[in-house]
């Protein structure tokens, strides 16, 4: 494991073991540095069905749909890294039709107005959807980054994870808020 990846993992582990991470007074760049570390961390604490990663030659792909808020940070963290024998690969997409080979997909805030159609396109596919738009997990995304009281927290939609046939580690779930879908008021 490279020094940069090790530092990112240590930072992510430290942050995940705290009840919440303070982002008070941080620049957006720093916020997305933390989120990039979490994205790497998610790859280690989620299990995909065998057909999603059929052999060791299949890379575990982290995708970014829409505008990229991470810059080079995510690429630097996963460079020369592997999870369960699968090398990590970062790809950027402008269209949801391109993301079929992704295992983790960060849906950028730039795509928020298309979120329902994006999630519908990915329905029942083994893609860990991650985002930071308002109510992301409640709107059927799997992991949402939430800032509450100036702290970075995770919201996890277990029903969406189960539909995607993804198994999320209890270690990650213990540090997350478990949420369900938003109910439409009539």
Show which residues each predicted segment covers.
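Short hydrophobic alpha-helices and adjacent helix-cap/hinge residues
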Residues: 2-186
